[in-house]
Amino acid sequence: AGPYAFGL
């Protein structure tokens, strides 16, 4: 998972 997976 990457930052965008957490909405960041």
Curated annotation (Swiss-Prot):
Keywords: Amidation, Neuropeptide, Secreted. It comes from the Eukaryota. Transmembrane segments: none annotated. One of its GO terms (biological process) is neuropeptide signaling pathway. One of its GO terms (cellular component) is extracellular region. The modification Leucine amide is found at residue 8. It is found in: Secreted. May act as a neurotransmitter or neuromodulator. Belongs to the allatostatin family. This is Carcinustatin-8. It comes from Carcinus maenas (Common shore crab).
